[in-house]
Amino acid sequence: MTTDVIQWLLESREPWTRYRTLLDLLDRPDDDPQVQTARAEMLAHPQVQTLVSEAAAWPGYALKRHNDAKHPIHKFSTLADFGAYATDPGLPAAIEAVLAHRSPEGALQTLVNIHQRYGGTGEGMWTWMLCDTPTLLYALLSFGLDDDECVRRAANHLASTIDENGWRCVVAPGLGKFRGPGRKADPCPIVNVYALKALSLSPDLADSPATRTGVEMLLGHWKDQKERKHYLFGIGTDFRKLKYPFVWYDILHVADVLGRFSFVHTDPRFREMVATITAQADEDGRYTAASMYRAWKGWSFADKKQPSPWLTFLALRIQRRCGMG
């Protein structure tokens, strides 16, 4: 990690990048004047204020596919990635809207539209699946709500849904026989990513049998990428492309989540994954998106022609966590 690239991040016009760089790469305390200034500028930034407004309009519209990058659920997770707090302007109302819909099991619910050909009604209904509820849980935990009783119950419920080979496609009991594609006994790679990301923020569950099983599922998938492909989730050229926000199953998302667990840092499978990312840096140590979500056009991480400060920060943080930077 060179001084030049760090300075480039600190001179970025992205206050969220400056804020996280100071905290995560330079270990500045929260009360550091530069940290506080960057944070204030982040919250005042028009793009961030738009994210907050879209989150506050929860549920926005019924979710039909979980890789819909423009859905408000991914505005929540991006605000969490940036470092928003539950008390930040606009977020209390958004959080209240999320907590207003919880299942009897404790899971946070999303307004979902399941097509009739998949056993749904074709209309919006409040329910949960393991490919949406962990993302909401991640956001609320990141916002600092780990002591909230509803949030703790949601975390415990998520941990309880683990199976012997990782998290599988599990949905609310009210959805009957509905489940996602693939073999019933197979783990779902993206569910394991979402679940691990959420539970990494739970003081009681971050290092638990559930998280260790989920981590092994993802590392095993990387190791066996040529021998086995989980339905919809191959590890090929597209998987290796740097992409943000963290919506779907790709290398930066997976490595960022795995890197949250210290017991992974020396695993050769993880380090090989990180090396695949670092090989994509340019001569100045900067990273450029190789793929993008059109719904996020206008953000640096959705520009395939110019290096992105935020993508560069994410890559450097992964390296720093495991001592490879």
Region locations from a protein language model:
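Preference for long, amphipathic alpha-helical scaffolds in soluble/luminal domains
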Residues: 1-325
